[in-house]
């Protein structure tokens, strides 16, 4: 059954070919995002920041965390502008809004996969992945 355009959640929809064509560009962005997120959640960095913060706002640890935060923000905005949905930074899991038989679904890709080969309903998530073929 076809979903009326007014009820669609996403303006942009990808075909599998379009999504696959973006992977060479998106994969390095996802890797950079994961690295920047790791810097933000690094326990040693947080301990150093906690020790340095009372003196003057954090010094080098504060700068490092600030730079990592800005990098995460910049990369997430770039991915959103590209029309993709980041589902899990650690896994490198992203979804591409798509239309399947007239209804909105997600094409699903995880860092390390050669191509977009799965899809799932908008509310199903990773466990609901089904092969495209």
Regions found by a protein language model. Give the residues of each.
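Long, hydrophobic N-terminal alpha-helical segment
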Residues: 1-48
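Residue-level detector of functional hotspots within protein domains
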Residues: 5, 70, 91-93
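A sequence-level detector of short, solvent-exposed, charge-rich linear segments
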Residues: 38, 42-45, 49-52, 91-98, ...
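A short, surface-exposed helix-loop junction/capping segment
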Residues: 49-61
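Glycine-rich, aromatic-bearing surface loops/beta-hairpins
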Residues: 77, 81-133
